[in-house]
Amino acid sequence: MKEFITKHRDKFQKISAISGAGISAESGIPTFRGSEGLWKNFRAEDLATPQAFSKNPKLVWEWYLWRRNIIETKRPNPGHFALVELERIHPDFFLITQNVDGLHSQAGSKKLTEIHGNIFINRCISCGQESKETISENTTPLPPQCQNCNSFLRPGVVWFGESYDDFKLNLSIQRMKHTDLLLVLGTSGSVSMPVYLAQIAKDSGALLIEINPERSSFSSSVDLFLQGKTGEVLPELIREILDNPS
């Protein structure tokens, strides 16, 4: 690690990071995939779709409130805080996260985009108005309604089969085209978007460093693979980067 950073220290003008479910898992948040995603015998793939919401919005909201309750008990870990420190000290850093739990913002990250949205945002299906008003099954009839137009509210996340937000996607693509060092953190590559963005960065000349407990589908494409948990490896990596400023 140290030799790699020393050799390439002139490539640290623009640093970016892509974070995935692995960094959230280290805070105790389930991935909500596979067996971890089962809720009342439903899979995430059965509930996180526009079709599921159209068919049974109350059921979908019950699942999302269950997820919100779990996430609210969790806190950012050293991996989140290491990225905050990198943002604080490095003049040109940007974070793209697949995670919808809001832990990066809770830790203090400001230069970021939540490309899959945020689970705590409520968005109207008609007028698009967004809020973070707390919704509880005990006090709010499900599905909740928009105070502006009375249409149903939905969670402010990207569902299976939906397009990404144009602004967030274009912002991420442009950042990948103009980044020197990309940190790929806790993402398995099972979702195509991080692979797509990382490939843009690589094709544009960026160096790629991946931190993961196991090799992923694009580990063969990175310049340095560091095996381990993000919360354990990333703080050390960032100390090396900040100790060797360009």
From Swiss-Prot:
Domain named Deacetylase sirtuin-type: residues: 1-245
Gene Ontology CC terms, in alphabetical order: cytoplasm
E.C. number(s) listed in UniProt: 2.3.1.286
Source organism of this protein record: Leptospira interrogans serogroup Icterohaemorrhagiae serovar Lai (strain 56601)
Protein name per the record: NAD-dependent protein deacylase
Annotated PROSITE patterns: SIRTUIN
InterPro entries listed in its UniProt record: DHS-like_NAD/FAD-binding_dom, NAD-dep_sirtuin_deacylases, Sirtuin, Sirtuin_cat_small_dom_sf, Sirtuin_class_III, Ssirtuin_cat_dom
Catalytic residues of the enzyme: 116 (proton acceptor)
Gene3D superfamilies: SIR2/SIRT2 'Small Domain, TPP-binding domain
Cofactor note text: Binds 1 zinc ion per subunit.
Domain commentary: 2 residues (Tyr-64 and Arg-67) present in a large hydrophobic pocket are probably involved in substrate specificity. They are important for desuccinylation activity, but dispensable for deacetylation activity.
Residues the record lists as binding substrate: 64, 67
Residues noted as binding NAD(+) in the record, renumbered to the chain: 20-39, 98-101, 186-188, 212-214, 230
Record keywords: Cytoplasm, Metal-binding, NAD, Transferase, Zinc
Classification via NCBIfam families: PRK00481.1-3
Job of this protein: NAD-dependent lysine deacetylase and desuccinylase that specifically removes acetyl and succinyl groups on target proteins. Modulates the activities of several proteins which are inactive in their acylated form.
Family in the record: Belongs to the sirtuin family. Class III subfamily.
Residues holding Zn(2+): 124, 127, 146, 149
Location relative to the cell: Cytoplasm
Cofactor(s) listed in the protein's UniProt record: Zn(2+)
Reaction catalyzed: N(6)-acetyl-L-lysyl-[protein] + NAD(+) + H2O = 2''-O-acetyl-ADP-D-ribose + nicotinamide + L-lysyl-[protein]; N(6)-succinyl-L-lysyl-[protein] + NAD(+) + H2O = 2''-O-succinyl-ADP-D-ribose + nicotinamide + L-lysyl-[protein]
